Each structure stands twice: as C-alpha cells, then as structure tokens.
Amino acid sequence: MARININNLTKQFEHVTALDDVTLELEAGQIVGLLGPNGSGKTTLIKLMNGLLTPTAGSILINDMEPGIETKKIVAYLPDRNALPEYMTTDQLISLYEDFFEDFNRAKAEAMINDLGIDPRLTLKKMSKGTKEKLQLCLVMARDAQVYLLDEPIGGVDPATRDYILRTIISNYNENAVVIISTHLIADIESVLDDVIFIREGKIVLHESAEMIREEKEESIDQLFREVFKC
C-alpha cells in the first residue's frame, strides 16, 4: 500500500521560495487533486516527489524511502510536457518502457494504444499534440505502480482528449496506489477526485476530502477554488 509523508518541505531557487514549509500525508486508494494557479508550486512539488529536484529543507518519504533509484521502481511520472524521443515509433516506445520498468504491462499498453487507432509504425514527431498526450498517458498508466504523479495531464488539449485522459486514469489505476493530478482546470477534473489540495505561492492553503467540501461547504470544488484564489 502506497504512503507519502512530506514534512516541513521547502524548496528555494536562489532568492525565490517555490515551496514553503509544506507538510502532507497521502494514503493509497485515493485520486488527489493538487490544485493551484500557474506558478503556485505544483510542478516543483511533483518533481521533488519524483526525485528530479532535491529539497532545500524538510523531507519526503515514499513508502519510508527518500525519492531516488528505489522509488522510481514504484512511482510512475507523467511530466507536464512531452519527454519522449520524437524519432521513436509507438512500438519502440512500448519496448523502451518494458526495458526500463519491471511493473510495465506491455499487453495493457498495446490494448490501450490499439483502442486509439494509432499506427504502431508512426513516429511521435508525426503525431498531433492530443495523440502524443494520450500515448504518453497510456505508457504511464500501463505500469502497475504504487504512486502516479500526473503533472497537468489535461492542460492544452481539447475537451474530447480531456475526457479520454480522465477515463484512462480512472479505469487503469491500481486501487492500492495513490494518484496525484496537478491542474488549474478544476471543473474538468473534480468529479474524479477523492482528496483535494489547494496550493498558493508555495504554501498549502487547504487539504480536505472532496466529499467533505461538498457536504460541509455545500459547494463544488471549482466554486471553492474560485473563492480561495479570487484576484
């Protein structure tokens, strides 16, 4: 069962504080929305959890391990922009993931990609932005990971692609895992969320269950987000 413990986490870049004394505890079996405007610290937090950045202060533990080589075996990461080699075909990318990740399910990836009707001989360079986003998500969700870190998976794509991405996440994630989705597009995603984190200027301003927000505050997550982040 996945477990993430973040304690007093701070990240500074020269004189800019991207994250300021963040403390969170996240358990398996949840889809968590990491919600905030652009520049609020969402991507920095996800990169720290994935071991791509190191903290200035504080700590992150994933199943009692600091982010590194061992956690990469159980963490599936979708970056906020395409990170796959443009010259590779779909078949080559599937083989690449199969070589890198022991928990990668080739048959599952092929089934998802086949449903999209993508020619396996087509290189990434010749695909549309929406198709690239779908393909990259299929590769990530074909892993039987314990933690899924999805950075802006629905940003910059059309509504039909957003619907596909959300369906793919819901139908393919491991229920013993925790899924963290960062976005500022709240209305599109709130129906799938179990837990909600609001982040602003590197600080956590709210961490609550989606159900509690709807029941106690009697409003949608999108409505609350607009109130909290009103200019």
Question: Residues of each region from the PLM?
Answer:
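Helix-to-loop junction immediately C-terminal to a conserved catalytic motif
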Residues: 50
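Conserved ABC transporter NBD signature motif
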Residues: 57-71
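ABC-family P-loop ATPase nucleotide-binding domains
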Residues: 81-135
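Catalytic Walker B motif of ABC-type/P-loop ATPase nucleotide-binding domains
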Residues: 148-152, 157
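The feature captures the beta-strand-to-loop junction immediately N-terminal to the Walker
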Residues: 32-37
